[in-house]
Curated annotation (Swiss-Prot):
Reactions listed under catalytic activity: [protein]-dithiol + NAD(+) = [protein]-disulfide + NADH + H(+); [protein]-dithiol + NADP(+) = [protein]-disulfide + NADPH + H(+)
Listed Pfam families: C1_2, Thioredoxin_8
Protein name per Swiss-Prot or TrEMBL: Probable nucleoredoxin 2
Family: Belongs to the nucleoredoxin family.
Function according to Swiss-Prot or TrEMBL: Probable thiol-disulfide oxidoreductase that may participate in various redox reactions.
UniProt GO molecular function: protein-disulfide reductase [NAD(P)H] activity
EC number: 1.8.1.8
Domain Thioredoxin: 15-176, 180-327
InterPro entries: C1-like_sf, DC1, Nucleoredoxin-like, Thioredoxin-like_fold, Thioredoxin-like_sf, Thioredoxin_domain
Highest taxon, organism lineage: Eukaryota
Keywords: NAD, Oxidoreductase, Repeat
Source species of the chain: Oryza sativa subsp. japonica
């Protein structure tokens, strides 16, 4: 990575404390002064974030966990919060949930200079600096999400090492190895414990979800219908609920709504380990593991929304077949139509002519590629929804 002029300036002026953070002190989460001299010799993470942005709220716990682990191991690492909050109460509320110091909220000039110097255009952003002020990683958010404290010291060599380890891990993956990460060798059935070994050779969906989650509730109903259809066809398919519930009551309520197996509840330790293993960032998420124990897809939710039970067994070959069928079916649709839900004429598009991922404005379900679209307004519907509506209007 090239050494920017400001990093050279940092070295000439005493490293991180001398130039990159040109202020007398920082403040702790409790409001006490923190001396810049305490940063000397440490790798620094400048954390640009704001209380109002959900992605920052989601990332802060991950960074906090990595921070505590590194502190316990005596790593020379410090994080500095650079707030993008709009008012002091929001800043103070967010900072109190962090274990590291921050640039004082009122030091607007410093925050502006840091944002401009590191070209911060979006949050969350974690700029990692070496003790001499050189940029090690322009944005380590993804690394912390994927690897936690193992990403330290965030160098290119360390990232390459982690990626190689990950490739070896997935290459030798089996269903039993996956669940060894969680510390469990069984899951709960309706009446009994089911050994993981009994599921080897099946296509298994790992369903990360929670009870108090509106998107999860909606998707669970759809997934349950598809699960029932596949079971009726005697397909070798099983789903395991991986609870992301914060309380056992929510877990039990979720289990009562689901016809499949469930990972035992243990305050989130087992589920968290599996979520980290598969880099799960949001729920609901459906990870599909094939009969050989290898990951087929982490996009099971999208595939179910797009293709319903026809997505099974979720392989690339099956999805290509479905896409070819869609291409053929599209030939039977008119090139344009008038839809009662929109004032403009809609034109047919594909992923090769302006189409892409979308949410159907008629049925609120996901779509991909083929659609009826209003280019002026961005209004899009499934081809089938356009045909159905036109049929009802006649």
């Amino acid at each position: 990575m090239g050494r920017e002029p400001e990093m050279e300036e940092a070295r000439e002026n005493g490293g991180v404390g001398g130039s990159v953070l040109p202020l007398a002190s920082l403040i702790s989460p409790t409001g006490n002064e923190v001396q810049i001299s305490e940063l000397e010799g440490k790798i620094i993470g400048l954390y640009f974030a704001a209380n109002w942005y959900p992605k920052c709220e989601a990332f802060t716990p991950a960074l906090t966990a990595a921070y505590h682990q590194l502190k316990e191991h005596g790593a020379g690492f410090e994080v500095i919060f650079v707030s993008c909050d709009e008012n002091r109460p929001s800043f103070e509320r967010f900072h109190r949930a962090m274990p590291w110091p921050a640039v004082p909220f009122g030091d607007i000039g410093c925050k502006k200079r840091l944002s401009e110097r590191f070209q911060v255009e979006g949050i969350p952003r974690l700029v990692v600096l070496a003790p001499n002020g050189e940029v090690v990683q322009p944005d380590a958010v993804e690394l912390v999400h994927r690897y936690g404290d193992r990403a330290f010291p965030f160098t290119s060599a360390r990232v390459a090492e982690l990626e190689a380890d990950e490739q070896r891990k997935f290459a030798s993956q089996t269903l039993e190895k996956i669940f060894s990460v969680s510390g469990k060798d069984y899951v709960n059935g309706s009446q009994e414990q089911v050994p993981i070994s009994s599921l080897v050779g099946k296509t298994v969906g790992l369903y990360f979800s929670a009870h108090r989650c509106a998107p999860c509730i909606k998707f669970t109903a759809k997934l349950a219908a598809i699960y029932s259809n596949l079971k009726g066809k005697a397909e070798d398919f099983e789903i395991i609920y991986i609870p992301m519930d914060k309380e056992e009551d929510g877990y039990l309520r979720s289990c009562s709504d689901m016809p499949w197996l469930a990972l035992p509840y243990d305050d989130g330790a087992s589920s968290g380990a599996l979520a980290r293993y598969f880099d799960v960032r949001e729920i609901p998420t459906l990870v599909v593991v094939g009969p050989d124990g290898k990951t087929v897809t982490r996009e099971g939710r999208n595939l179910v929304n797009l293709y319903f039970d026809m997505a099974f067994p979720f392989t690339d070959e099956q999805i290509r077949l479905l896409q070819e069928m869609e291409d053929e079916d599209a030939k039977g649709y008119p090139p344009s139509l008038r839809h009662t839900g929109h004032r403009h004429e809609l034109s047919i598009v594909s992923d090769k002519s302006g189409g892409g991922p979308y949410i159907c404005c008629e049925c609120d379900e996901q779509g991909l590629g083929w659609a009826y679209q209003c280019i002026a307004c961005g209004y899009e519907i499934h081809l089938r929804c356009g045909r159905d509506m036109e049929g009802r209007a006649e």
